[in-house]
Amino acid sequence: MKTPWELLKESKTKIKTTWRIAFVSALVLGLLIHLPVMLSDIPNHDGLGSMYFDQNMITSGRWFLTVACGFSSYFTIPWVIGLIGLIWLALTAAVLTEVLELKDPVTITVVSGLLVSFPALASTFAYVFTMDGYMLALFLAVLAVLFTAKYPRGYLAGAVCLAFSMGIYQAYL
């Protein structure tokens, strides 16, 4: 049995440098950009009724949203939900570098920065009570593209990822 430190050392050699750059730059830039929202709870029209919300939105076709938002809490805790959402977003940036076959660290950082600061995505932070689920949906949608583009029968895994993404939030189709 390996110790956690040995597993960490092994994982460092297995994770591509481009993925690490994308993940870290998206996480750091995301924190810098979205920290004010994560540290305060300024509810919008939906947020007022969602201080505790189990995200059971099956009538809207969001059959997987309850599970996706269940990783954090059904309570609106902006910094927890925001951090989990940023981790999903950073993973999306890493997958995006693979899809776009980016190699240059500056380009990777710029693409990661554009991803976390894009206005349509930044407005999702106003709906902080569902943000972690929505960021998981984005991750699954980009992962579906990666599987479909890179692997011979990747469309099968891509279809599963896309189905779960659509079960969370249909806008990322």
Predicted regions and their residues:
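Membrane-interface alpha helices of multi-pass inner-membrane proteins
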Residues: 155-171
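Membrane-interface transmembrane helices that cradle and orient dolichyl/undecaprenyl
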Residues: 141-155
